[in-house]
């Protein structure tokens, strides 16, 4: 399996080589902060993404990523990781009216000291995970593929994009967890030029599946696996020795965008999406235990001037996410059939992130620089209905960053990024019936709340050097970056990243 994917990876790289040629302008277009200002909003529409870039650019590289926390900020994600990845990315301008882009990657590595989590994709499936009190290091493998195409005719644009991820996470000592994930996202976008604006709409669909199990081989016996249901609760009837389950889910979304055709004027973005994930117990004829629902709304409105040597942008953003969870009431079994006789919505989670961000930059033929800032309010409220449990925290945060890109000679270019951020807690609260909880569950919840309400400070830096081979359009690059995060609980995180590759 690995060999087949690796051959496909090399074939993709070989095909892309020779179809593009790197220039300083292409490097700036694909890496400058101001050129990618709307990457997380409008570029989710492939019709906009594919026609926002004008110059071909490809990279093939290997990278290593190391992260360590002195005490895990989130127990279920462990104390850090060491990951290695090989990746190829390309953008091709096929003609004045069409473009294609793609990526292929393989990642492998290790996640350290994961506890209270025996499932993959914790951020996505939390709180409906399989968990135990022992945990340990896990091994990770991931294959990723992405491809898109956009075309314009007259005033109309059309784009399509597919993103696929296959991931395998496992542990080779007891408790031997295993999670196998497949995740496919398809995007379709259209846009039309009318008046002074480009008006765009996009659709997105996602299909997700994970098979998840835990085994024990040691002679000392097993420990219970808990079917977690939120804020330190479990589905006790099916906890213990029921250790094989799977998740099925996915969803859909729609996004709308408006952008000025001359790169100066007001712009806006709105997105609505809905997803749901069922947890089913394979040990008991795939009876569904829980179902997690996501409802999200994103809105952004701003003004920008990106034409000429000066770049200015300012926008306001609001992200609302509602997560709710249903627990099925399962009747008495008959001939291995477990009837569902009802359901209760027991878990509720509300996340708010609202912020104002701005950018000011200056660019010329030999380089560009910009300053960018962000200030906002973040809130996370969780509730379990009965017995009543609550946990909440809110923070005000600010971030200031800068980027400097410069062509030092005909063959050497340099890029420097730096940033500082601070997240300060403004309110927090917890309601937990400790008297009715096991000691291990109490410790887990207290740890979660301890870091949920903490203050955080962050410093980050990244430097990249590009070298173009003499007489060739092929270049080499090296990139080194990292960050340092400290929190008010007297714990810290350090993160290092190294990448080496070629551009063409």
What are the language-model segments listed below?
Residues 64-70, 106-110, 151-155, 164-168, ...:
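Transmembrane beta-strands of outer-membrane beta-barrel pores
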Residues 86-92, 145-151, 186-192, 254-260, ...:
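Residues on the lipid-exposed face of transmembrane beta-strands in outer-membrane beta-barrel proteins
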Residues 20-112:
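N-terminal, post-signal peptide beta-strand-biased segments of exported outer-membrane/organellar beta-barrel
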